Structure formats: C-alpha cells, structure tokens
C-alpha cells in the first residue's frame, strides 16, 4: 500500500514538473519576435525514448514549416477529434480571433440590371454541315471586318437580374436546365467569355470588377473536372496551395499573435501550430492539403493518382471533391460553386455542404452554390435561396420564406415533398398544376415572368429592392478584402513550383520518353544498316547525294520526333487554361520550365543518334565534326519542340492542332532546300526559304560534313573539292561560317518560338465549341421578336441543357406495332471474375472473385422494378449478366424468358438496354438516330411508312417531339443536355419494339425536374405493357415511389429484399422495421435513404444481423421463390420465341443503313471533313506556286529530283495528315458500335465496310482538289492519260493512308495509342520510299522492304506516269553527261514505264489490304471490358 501511495506521489510530481517545463517552453516562445514566433510552435509528441500512450505526450518546440507527414496527419486528426465535428473546430478558430477583437474581411457581391445575351443560329442553319461551316467562317471574318453583322438571332440568357450575395451566409442557386445558373456564376466571378453581350453592374463591396482582381478575390468551381491525371490527390492539392498562396492569412496571424501576447492569452497548442502552418503555406508544408483531404474524405485516396479514361485512378465522385478542394486550399474569400454534387451520393454531398456552411459562418465568407437535386437535409443547411428560370430571378432571400412566397401565389408544397424539388417543378408548365392549392379558383398557368414580377411586391423582394437602392458604403470595405495583385505568390516561387510540377509530370510520363528514345534508337540502328559504310563511297557527286540523303533523314527524324509535343500539350491545355484563368501562375511560369526541362531530352536524342550512326555510316572521321553534328541536331530538336508547342497552343483541338503541325512541318521541309533546291524555288517564295529552320539545319550539317577531309579531293580537274562541288550542285552554301550561322539561327528560332508559345498561351482561349439545344417554344418565349425557327443550337458553354415545354401526355396502351409481353425469371445467379493482379499482391489468394451470390427474382410485364443498392452492391453487374452484356467472367444459374431458357441471340431481338453513359453517334439528329435504330432492329417486313409512324409514336411517348431536329452531339461538349440524352437513350431502345427494357441509372446526373421527366417517360413505357427494370442510386421520394417492385442488394452481391413496395413504401418499411433493433422511419423521411442507412455494413455489425440471411429466412423470400417457379414454367398454349435469322435485317440492308448514318456523320463533322478539304486547298496552292512549272522542266537531273521531291512531300504529308485525323473519328464510331452491336443491330463487317465506303467520295474530292490545282500550276503535261494516271495514284494513295489510320485505330484501344503505333511505320516508309536513297543503292538485306513499302509504289507510279516515256536529253548532276529521262529513271531508280499497270495494281492492293485488316480487327478485337 505504501508503495502504491509513493507511486501516485511520484506521478503527481512528475506531472507538475511537466507542466512547469511546458510553461517555460511557452514563455521562451513568447520572448521571440512576432515574425519569428509565427514560424515556431509547441507540438505535442511522445517523450523521447518512450512509446506514445494516452496522456503521456510532451510539448516540443517545432518549426511549423518543417512538419513531418506523420506530424501533419496526427495534428489534423487530433484537432478534428477534439472538436467532435467541423462546426466546433471552426468555432474554436473564430473564438480565438474574437477574443482579441479581430474581424475577418467581409465581401458583399451585388449585381444590378445584369443582362447577358447570346447570338445563335436557328434551324438547319445551326447544324454543323460543311456548307454551314463555310458560311460560319465567312460570317465571322466579315463580322471581324465590321462589314456584316447578321446571320444570328439574339437569345437572352440573363434578363435584367439584380440581387445581393451576402457575407457570412450560404446561398443556394436553384433552377431548371438552361435557366442561366452557370452564366450568373461566371458573370459574378468575372469569367464570362468575349462571345456574349453583357450589360449591368457587378460590384464587390461597392468596387467594380476593374478596380481589383476578381479571379484572386473569388474562386469559381467549374462543372468540369480538369486535373493532371498523372498526379496524386495530395500532389494536386499541394501544388494548388503553393500557387494560390495564403492571401491575408499571414498578416492576420501576425496581428493575432501580437494582440494575444499583449493581453496574455495562451491559445491551444495544436490549434496554434495548425493556424501558423496554414499561414506559412506556399513554402514546403502541406498541412492545408492534409486538412482538406481529411474533411472531404479524400484521405483514403491521398496517394492515388487522379487518372482519366486511359489511366485508372480515383472515382468520379472523388474527382469532383478534388475539384472543389483544389480551390479551398487557396485564400479566396468568395466562392462560386457550379453543380459540385454531380456524381456524389446524398450523404457525401451533405458532409461537403455542411463543411462549407460552417466555414462560411465562422470565417465570414461569401458562398453561392448551385446544386442539382439537394436532399432535404442538405437544403436545410443553406441560409438563402436564389431561384432562377428562363434567365429571370423568381425568388432571392431567406430559405424559410421561399415556400411562403409560392403559397401566396396559390402553390403549396406537399408534406412529403422535397422543398428544393418543389421550387424547381413549380416553375414548369408540365408540373405546376399538381401544386395548385386554391381549389375555389380554376387553375391557370403562371409564367416565370409573372412569378418574377410578383416577387418584387413580396416583402422579401421589397426589402431587396430597398437595399439595392442604397449604394454600398465603400468606407466599410476592409483594406485586405479585395485582392489587387494578380498572383498570390512571388513570381520566383511560382516558377519554382511549376518547375517541380512539370518535372514530376515528366517522371510520371517517363514511359513516353523511354518509348521515344527506344523508337529513335531502333530507327538509328536501321539507318546505320541502310547507309552502311561498306556500301557508302566518296568517289562521285552521286555518292555525295546518298550522303546528303542520310544527313537529310537525320534532320527529318529529329524534326519529326518533336511532333509528339502536339498531343501531349493539347491534352494538358484544359488544365493550363484552368490554372491561367484562376490566376495560379502566369503562362511564362509554365513555358520557361517546359523549355528548360526539354534540354536533357534533346541532349539524349541528338546524342543517341550521333553515337549510333556517325562512324558506322562513315561520315568524316574528325571528332570536331562529330561534335558539330551533335550540336546542330541538339538545337534542331529544341526548335522542333518549340515549333510543335506553338502549333498545339494555336490549334487547341487535337484534329486541328495535328493539321497545323503537319502543315508547319511541310512548309519547313518543302522550303528547306533539299526536297526542292534553292535555285528552283520561285522568287515569290524565296522568303520562305530564308525563314525555314530546315534550310539552316540542312546547310549547316552539309557544310560540317562536305568541307571535311574525306571530301577534299579535287573534282573533275576544277579548282574545287568534291565536297564543294556537291554543295554547289545541290544549291547549298560552301562557306565554313554557315555552320555557325545554322547553329545560331536554330538557337534563335528556339527562343522566338518559345516566346510565341507563351504569347498564344496567354492570349488565346479554348475553342468555344460547347453548345446546347434549346427547344423552339423556349426560344420563342424568351425572344418573341425572333421569327419562328426549329432549333437554336450554338450557345457555347453558357447554356448546358434545355427546358422542355409542352403538355402532359396521356398514358398509351396501344401502338402501331404490336409486341409480345414477356416475363424474365432468374434463379441462383452467381457471377465470378478473375482476381486482378493488384488484388493478389494485397494478399488475396483466391483465383476468382464472386460478385453475385445466389440472386433470385423475376421481372414481369407492366411492372416497373427498381434495382437498388450501395456502390459495389452489384446492381449494374446483375443487369449486365441478365442482359448478356458481360464480355468475361463465369456465370452460373438459370435465366428463363416466359418459361423458356434464355437464348442470347433471340433475347437481343426482344430486349433493350439503356446504358448509363448515353452513347450515341454525335453527328445525327434525334429523329435520325431513332430512324436508324428502327431500321436495323424492327423486322424486315415492316414497311418504311409504318416504321416512321412508330418512331413518331415513340418520340411522343418520351416527349422528344420538340427536339426531333436537334443534333445529338458529344456529352458535355455540344448538342443535347444530359436529361435529353437520357430520353434519347430510352427512345433508341424503344423503337426496337422490345418486350423487356433494362435501364442503368436513368436519373443520374439530372436535376429534380429532369429526373421527373425521365421517370414519367419510363412510366409511360411501363403502361404500354412492357417489362422494365431500372438501377437507381439513392432516389428521391417521388422517384422511388413511382416504382412497383424493388430488388434491394447489399455490398457483396446479395439480395436483402425482393418484392412489392406497397403504397408509400409500406411493405418495404414493415419488412425492415420487423427486424429487432432497426430504428423506425421518421415521418416524411425518404424510404430509400432510410433503408440504405438501416442496412449499412455498420448497422449489420451493431445489430449482429446478416440482412441477406434474414431475407432468405423470410416469408417474402418464399413468395419470391414460388413466383419464380411458376413463371419459370411455360404456359401450355405458349411457344418459344424464335427468329429465322440472327439479325433483323440482311447483310446488305445493314450495310446500307450503316452507310446512310456514316454519310450524315461525315457531312456534319466539318472539323474532320471541311478542315481536311481546307488543308488540301492550302497545300495544293502552296505546292503549286512553289513548284511553278516544274512539270515542264525536263532538262536536268535536278528537274526530275525537284518534281519527285514535290510528289514525295505531298504524298507523305497529306497522307499522314489523313491517317492522323481519321483516328479520333473512327475511335468515336467504334465506341458507339459496341453498344449497337451488343443490341443486335448489325454485324461487324457491314459497319466496317460502311466506314471504308464513306471515305471514297471525300478522298475523291480531296484528290481532285489537290490534283487539279497542283497539276495545273506545276504545268505537267496536259494529256488525258497522264492526268488520269496522276489522279489515280493520288486517289489510291490518300485512300490507303486513310485506311492505314483506320486500321491502326482498330487494332489499338483508342486514338491516343494509335498514333504511337503508326508513327514508326511513317518513318520507315519515308526512309525506304526511294527518295533519299534509290532502290539500287539500298543494301540487299533491306531491299525487300522497299517492295513492301506502299509509298515507294506511289512514287514509282507518279514519277513514271509523268516522265517515264520522255526520250528528250537530260543533263546529269556532274554537268557533263547526258541521257534520256527513260534511261535515267531506269538506271537511277529502277523505274520502267511498261511496269505501270503492276504498280497501279499494287497501290490499289494496299488499299484493299488495310481495309480488310481494319474490318477484321473491328470484328475480332473488342477493347470494351464489362
């Protein structure tokens, strides 16, 4: 006992001693100057030499800028754990400032009489056809010259709106699609683009936007999640924090520390360290990133890369949270957040909004957030609501009075109705009547304009008007509230951060650079064996020409190797534009590090080439000349990288940038002095010769070689060396100083081009091709002065979807085409997949992973069934298994259709599957998409008129009549809104007249009103007697209770409920409430949310109940089993459904339908077709004027070489451009075909052959454009035979290049990988085509590849068809010997005119070869994994 007392006494004295030591440490810290004290803090850590235990921590003085990752994590965990929740944590921060009477800067945002108008095209004029594209370009040019201002219709987006966004209050922005929410947020953030007409005033604390920097004062969180896919979540947030800086945090902290010291206040140690670390952010610490990851739930994926469609990374919901968190690590006092909950479940959205609410209240921030479908508990977190529709503000004020305003107008929110949903639906003409509560008076539709006018007389509206009438007192503005600096960190720090960021990206993309190095090494090895020194001589001018070809190929390779910068930069541009617009850093802070970091790659590539080729080829052996070649290739590579960065920043679109890059490369090479000699370039193009980097490289590398000792022998008794004769004969300079002129010029080009890259990145914006579709009624309502038109499409990025006006449809039971109602039963379904290697590495020993476990159920005609479960429960997996959409894995169990075993080929004909991704051909209109689907999926005996009537009935059923002529477009880019695209997906399946329809998440990503429209569509379909099943993710009460039956799955792929919902979900609620311990549902609470909460994994652990086992033991399970047993037996009078053929249509009907669609798609894809034609016109004019009358010059060997050079350059560059530009087009169409082929619309071969066929007329036009212009300007011999031969070879050459691009896309997963696979073959075709080294000079071991090279056959045909029959004298390069063109072509190249027919057959044969391989790849290769 005495020992115990002594121990307690020692413990007490030890604690007193610790307290004294802590007091001494604090006193020592307080004696430091304030600035030094801001960097030091007391951090609780284990006593030295002891393990961390509860209550056994000691305070240690630390530098807050140097906290270890473990200390940062532990500090954040302690703070949030001690506070209990985020609200208490923010309250502690606020209390610390209040204790010393420091106020936070407040910002009030006002907008008065704000009007924003867009200019749009209407009707068929809005479709992106080739003629419309040309008209748009012409009109834009004339408008720029102020000559023409017509052609477009004005559409109001925001119509004279006014309001106040108050500090310390959370504002919710609600409104239906196309109401102007995004435009309002962009306008308030000072981010509207130049294409809109804006009037009105926007002020922050009474200051106009031009008096400060709004991009630094506020932060706009976009709907788009643009991030560097190679970076982890932590790295993304840390980089954003370093760029944005700490703003006023540091100054406020210093003042706080000064006042606390004066008043003798000792703050909490952990909170003190936390606030100091946040105020010193932007240096090396990342505590703010750690904190944001913790409160946003991103800590579980902190070290996971962000990823994209190519790289597996974080989920879509996590990416959306990262987008928000990226700006919260900054110092903006005003937050504009645009639909930040897309892809998030309601619980996560609630936590995020809750954090923002407490942050706004405690720190006096100003926050406005637009949400799609806020849950009731989320809606309650907001202080104010702004309700906007048709560009007019209907209500703005406290959330509590919004319902009262509409009640005064005669519209009441039902008891079980989400208020946010009510506010959006009450403005809709389709939904308004159900909320009318003045039954004594007849209902009349109240328009948005009437609501807006009524609000002005409402008490809240009057108060708002009175407040706006009194100008903001600018003297109340806190001096630190509005940012006047463009950037939050010093320029040097930004440069350093960018350097580290880009270095990290280079390391993460190291496989690209390694692949380029390996590719260059392989080509260097091939070059070494082609120009092998044992076959290379130095005896004549002809030998010199071979060396010139080798040097030229080296230059071309180094120049070509920079082309990958185009795709790499275009992929990064959205991120760079986002960073630029948010004022993360100036563009030069990005371009300078990118230039510096490219130096090592240039050193490696040029060094590798010289090291492998120089001495093996047999160049001049002097070491100084070897170093000279290395130095020259290094600066050429730097010039090449800069040139293609300029083209990428100028093009800004992959297809356009690739075209620009090809054009730049072509201009540089054709005027470089090798393909066409200097003497042969016309006077009007000689300026191009002098500004071509290739010219300086060609002259410098040639002088470096041919003035060497190896070429010093005297030439033909003349007073010059052989080397000088070669230089002179090829129009090259022979003075030594031209080497240094070349090096200096290339260095200068690298500097100038990098400057232009910076300039374009600063001045140019993303190409504004984002569009939306607005219905005819809507645009007439908004702009009554406009003449009637069908559709308005071209709204850029300011309208993201459309409101749909019309009348409710009656339930439809009969349609023009009958169908057979069918049921589907499935029993004991199990599904297994192979365990991925990454999971095995984590300790999983099984070879197979089971995703579905003994799932049993049934879907019946006229019954709408919901398939619900948390993420990972297996909802989509089950539906894919039942629909036969899985491409891998093992399936067990039985599936029957109306009692007969399911046959997949038959089932495809009678079922429809609406995928979540809404994949459609982007260049078709709505009605064309439906007619196309109906043509291929309805039986062949259905005539055209009946098919058309049926399609129109389906359009009426899904409410798409008003949008029949609208372009489908690409998701998030142009065309239909998300909600309209959902309904199109349903309609496309419905026109197949299916008996069973599967729908995967039909309401995901939609606002409440759009979701209601989609569900009304679904209910209409069910009422026709079809069998429908939908997966659904946490639906609202209205949506959930529109279903008849429910299949509820828990994580792991097990059913825990299968049966009817009952009225107001009574059956479901009674089933789960009968389980002991399950909490009862609250009145008015969403049954879907309740059932997910009470059946969670945590609840299972608390209750000790396995809900799947409970269901299997229940009476409900027995009833389901009995129903399945009954439906699994066919009726006596029934027959098994069979079809005579696999597809509805025969082969040629499939081919004709696919060709019809592809023809429309090509006609409406001007970025591909029109740009290709425009590029061809420019190239043909340029080549024709450069090669002026080349075809009529036939006196010397150089004349033949010049003509061949022009043909070679045209074939190679126009061909490669065709191959590159077709790859994204084929990739999109192949992606669409995966869905269409899975639906049984057609087989692979008709689809592939339609893509091959549709190119024929476009390539023909391209060939005619180039052939006619170039042939005329080049003055080739105008005979019918020679001209037709020229057109023939150009046509089939461009055709096989295009088919080659299609083939490389078909054999690779996507159009990003396709160019990488295709590029090495372009290089080999270039090397072995016979231009740089004739066939007779190619070593015997490589000569076979000359015959396997399609470009060599093209040059054979083009040159021989034009010059192969000429008998006139031809002067050779030595200036002495003469021969005939026939003999020269035969002796030098091995070309014979009588072989022309075989050559033509070979060129056409390559077209057939590539087309067949493309078709077979489409048929047998499937890169979609489900």
UniProtKB/Swiss-Prot annotation:
Location(s) in or outside the cell: Membrane
The ABC transmembrane type-2 domain, residue ranges: 493-706, 1149-1363
Keyword Transport: yes
One cellular-component annotation, GO: membrane
Name of a matching Pfam family: ABC_trans_N
GO molecular function annotations of the record: ABC-type transporter activity; ATP binding; ATP hydrolysis activity
Family matches, as SUPFAM superfamilies: P-loop containing nucleoside triphosphate hydrolases (SSF52540)
Location of the ABC transporter domain: 142-415, 824-1076
Binding site for ATP 1: 175-182
Species the sequence originates in: Oryza sativa subsp. japonica (Rice)
UniProt topology in membrane: Multi-pass membrane protein
Segments forming a coiled coil: none
TM annotation in the entry: 511-531, 544-564, 592-612, 630-650, 655-675, 681-701, 741-761, 1168-1188, 1200-1220, 1245-1265, 1283-1303, 1313-1333, 1341-1363, 1398-1418
Family matches, as CDD domains: ABCG_PDR_domain1 (cd03233), ABCG_PDR_domain2 (cd03232)
Role summary: May be a general defense protein.
Binding annotation for ATP 2: 869-876
Annotated keywords: ATP-binding, Membrane, Nucleotide-binding, Repeat, Transmembrane, Transmembrane helix, Transport
InterPro entries: AAA+_ATPase, ABC2_TM, ABC_trans_N, ABC_transporter-like_ATP-bd, ABCG_dom, ABCG_PDR_1, ABCG_PDR_2, P-loop_NTPase
Signal peptide residue numbers: none
Major localization listed first in the record, in broad terms: membrane
Protein family according to the UniProt entry: Belongs to the ABC transporter superfamily. ABCG family. PDR (TC 3.A.1.205) subfamily.
Protein name: ABC transporter G family member 31
């Amino acid at each position: 006992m005495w020992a115990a007392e002594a121990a307690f006494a020692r413990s007490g004295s030890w604690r007193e001693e610790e307290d004294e030591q802590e007091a001494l440490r604090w006193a020592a810290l307080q004696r430091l100057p304030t600035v030094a004290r801001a960097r030091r803090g007391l951090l609780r850590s284990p006593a030295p030499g002891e393990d961390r235990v509860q209550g056994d921590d000691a305070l240690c003085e630390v530098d807050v800028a140097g906290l270890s990752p473990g200390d940062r994590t532990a500090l954040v965990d302690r703070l949030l754990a001690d506070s209990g929740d985020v609200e208490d944590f923010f309250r502690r921060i606020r209390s610390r400032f209040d204790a010393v009477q420091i106020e936070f800067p407040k910002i009030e945002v006002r907008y008065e009489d704000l009007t924003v108008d867009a200019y749009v095209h209407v009707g068929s004029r809005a479709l992106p056809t080739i003629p419309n594209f040309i008209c748009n370009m012409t009109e834009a040019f004339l408008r720029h010259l102020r000559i023409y201002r017509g052609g477009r219709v004005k559409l109001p987006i925001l119509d004279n709106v006014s309001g106040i966004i108050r500090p310390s209050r959370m504002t919710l922005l609600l409104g239906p699609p196309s109401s102007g929410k995004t435009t309002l947020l962009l306008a308030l953030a000072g981010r509207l683009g130049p294409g809109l007409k804006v009037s009105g005033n926007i002020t922050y604390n009474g200051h106009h936007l031009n008096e400060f920097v709004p991009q630094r004062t506020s932060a706009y969180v976009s709907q788009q999640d643009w991030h560097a896919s190679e970076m982890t979540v932590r790295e993304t947030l840390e980089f954003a924090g370093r760029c944005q800086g700490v703003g006023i945090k540091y100054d406020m902290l210093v003042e706080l520390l000064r006042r606390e010291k004066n008043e003798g206040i000792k703050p909490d140690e952990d909170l003190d360290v936390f606030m100091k670390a946040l105020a010193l952010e932007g240096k090396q610490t990342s505590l703010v990133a750690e904190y944001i990851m913790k409160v946003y739930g991103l800590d579980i994926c902190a070290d996971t890369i962000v990823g994209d469609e190519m790289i597996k990374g974080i989920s879509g919901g996590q990416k959306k949270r990262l987008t928000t968190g990226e700006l919260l690590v900054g110092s903006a006092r005003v937050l504009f957040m645009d639909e930040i909950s897309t892809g998030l479940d309601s619980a996560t959205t609630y936590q995020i909004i809750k954090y923002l609410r407490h942050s706004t209240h405690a720190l006096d921030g100003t926050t406005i957030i637009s949400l799609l479908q806020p849950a009731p508990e989320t809606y309650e977190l907001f202080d104010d609501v702004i309700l906007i529709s048709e560009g007019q503000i209907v209500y703005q004020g406290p959330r509590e009075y919004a319902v009262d305003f509409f009640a005064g107008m005669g519209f009441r929110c039902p008891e079980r109705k989400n208020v946010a949903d009510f506010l959006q639906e009450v403005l809709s003409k389709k939904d308004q009547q159900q909320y009318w509560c003045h039954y004594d008076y007849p209902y009349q539709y109240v328009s948005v304009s009437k609501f807006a006018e009524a609000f002005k007389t409402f008490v809240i509206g009057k108060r708002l008007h009175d407040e706006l009438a009194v100008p903001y007192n600018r003297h109340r503005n806190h001096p630190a509230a509005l940012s006047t600096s463009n950037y939050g960190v010093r320029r040097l720090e930004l440069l350093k951060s960018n350097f580290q960021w880009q270095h990290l990206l280079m390391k993460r993309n190291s496989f690209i650079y390694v692949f380029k190095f390996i590719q260059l090494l392989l080509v260097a090895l091939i070059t070494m064996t082609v120009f092998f020194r044992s076959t290379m001589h130095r005896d004549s001018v002809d030998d010199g020409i071979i060396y010139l070809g080798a040097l030229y190929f080296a230059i071309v390779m180094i120049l070509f190797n920079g082309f990958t910068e185009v795709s790499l930069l275009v992929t990064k541009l959205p991120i760079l534009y986002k960073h630029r617009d948010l004022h993360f850093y100036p563009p030069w802070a990005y371009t300078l590090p990118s230039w510096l970091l490219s130096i090592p790659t240039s050193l490696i590539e040029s060094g590798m080439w010289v090291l492998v080729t120089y001495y093996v080829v047999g160049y001049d052996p002097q070491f100084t000349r070897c170093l000279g070649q290395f130095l020259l290739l290094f600066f050429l590579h730097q010039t090449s990288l800069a040139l293609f960065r300029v083209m990428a920043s100028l093009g800004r679109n992959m297809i356009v940038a690739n075209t620009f890059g090809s054009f730049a490369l072509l201009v540089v090479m054709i005027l470089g002095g090798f393909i066409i000699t200097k003497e042969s370039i016309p006077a009007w193009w000689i300026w191009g010769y002098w500004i071509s980097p290739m010219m300086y490289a060609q002259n410098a590398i040639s002088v470096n070689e041919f003035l060497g000792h190896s070429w010093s022998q005297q030439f033909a008794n003349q007073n010059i060396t052989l080397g000088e004769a070669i230089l002179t004969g090829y129009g090259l300079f022979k003075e030594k100083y031209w080497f240094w002129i070349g090096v200096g010029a290339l260095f200068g080009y690298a500097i100038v081009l990098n400057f232009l890259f910076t300039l374009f990145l600063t001045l140019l914006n993303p190409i504004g091709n984002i569009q939306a579709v607005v219905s005819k009624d809507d645009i007439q309502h908004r702009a009554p002065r406009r003449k009637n038109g069908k559709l308005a499409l071209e709204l850029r990025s300011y309208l993201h979807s459309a409101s749909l006006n019309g009348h409710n449809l009656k339930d439809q039971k009969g349609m023009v085409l009958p169908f057979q109602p069918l049921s589907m039963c499935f029993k004991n379904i199990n599904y297994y997949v192979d365990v991925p290697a990454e999971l095995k590495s984590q300790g999983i020993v099984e070879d197979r992973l089971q995703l579905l476990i003994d799932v049993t159920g049934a879907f019946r005609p006229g019954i709408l069934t919901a398939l619900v479960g948390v993420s990972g429960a297996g909802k989509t997996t089950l539906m894919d298994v039942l629909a036969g959409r899985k491409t891998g894995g093992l399936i067990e169990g039985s599936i029957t259709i109306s009692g007969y075993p399911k046959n997949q080929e038959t089932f495809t004909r009678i079922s429809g599957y609406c995928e979540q991704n809404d994949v459609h051909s982007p260049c078709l209109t709505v009605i064309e998409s439906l007619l196309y689907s109906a043509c291929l999926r309805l039986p062949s005996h259905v005539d055209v008129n009946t098919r058309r009537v049926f399609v129109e009935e389906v359009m009426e059923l899904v409410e798409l009549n008003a949008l029949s002529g609208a372009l489908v477009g690409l998701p998030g880019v142009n065309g239909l809104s998300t909600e309209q695209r959902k309904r199109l997906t349903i309609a496309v399946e419905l026109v197949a007249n299916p008996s069973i329809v599967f729908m995967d998440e039909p309401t995901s990503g939609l606002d409440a009103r759009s979701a209601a429209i989609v569900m009304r569509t679904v209910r209409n379909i069910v009422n026709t007697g079809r069998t429908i099943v939908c997966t659904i993710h946490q639906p609202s009460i209205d949506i959930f209770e529109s279903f008849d039956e429910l299949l509820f799955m828990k994580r792991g792929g097990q059913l825990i409920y299968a049966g009817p919902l009952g009225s107001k979900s009574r059956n479901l609620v009674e089933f789960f409430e009968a389980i002991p311990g399950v909490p009862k549902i609250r009145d008015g609470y969403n049954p879907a949310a309740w059932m997910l909460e009470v059946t969670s994994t945590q609840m299972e652990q608390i209750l000790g109940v396995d809900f799947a086992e409970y269901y299997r033991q229940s009476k409900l399970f027995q009833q389901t089993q009995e129903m399945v047993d009954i439906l699994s037996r066919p009726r006596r009078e029934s027959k098994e459904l069979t079809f005579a053929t696999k597809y509805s249509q025969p082969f040629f009907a499939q081919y004709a339908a696919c060709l019809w669609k592809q023809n429309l798609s090509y006609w409406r894809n001007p970025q591909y077709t029109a740009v290709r034609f425009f590029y061809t016109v420019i190239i043909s004019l340029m080549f024709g004027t450069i090669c002026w009358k080349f075809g009529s010059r036939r006196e010397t060997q150089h004349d033949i070489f010049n003509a061949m050079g022009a043909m070679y350059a045209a074939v190679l560059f126009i061909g490669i451009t065709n191959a590159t530009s077709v790859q994204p087009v084929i990739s999109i169409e192949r992606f669409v075909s995966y869905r269409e082929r899975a639906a049984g619309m057609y087989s692979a071969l008709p689809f592939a052959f339609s893509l091959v066929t549709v190119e024929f007329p476009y390539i023909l036009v391209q060939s005619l454009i180039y052939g006619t212009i170039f042939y005329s300007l080049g003055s080739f011999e105008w005979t019918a035979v020679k001209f037709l031969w020229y057109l023939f070879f150009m046509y089939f050459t461009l055709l096989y290049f295009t088919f080659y691009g299609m083939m490389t896309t078909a054999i690779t997963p996507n159009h990003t990988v396709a160019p990488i696979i295709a590029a090495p073959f372009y290089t080999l075709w270039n090397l072995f085509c016979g231009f740089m080294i004739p066939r007779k000079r190619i070593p015997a071991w490589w000569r076979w590849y000359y015959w396997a090279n399609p470009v060599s056959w093209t040059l054979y045909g083009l040159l021989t068809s034009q010059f192969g029959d000429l008998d006139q004298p031809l002067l050779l390069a030595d200036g002495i010997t003469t021969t005939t063109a026939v003999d020269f072509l035969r002796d030098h190249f091995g070309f014979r005119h009588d072989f022309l027919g075989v050559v033509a057959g070979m060129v056409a044969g390559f077209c057939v070869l590539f087309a067949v391989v493309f078709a077979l790849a489409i048929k047998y290769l499937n890169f979609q994994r489900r």
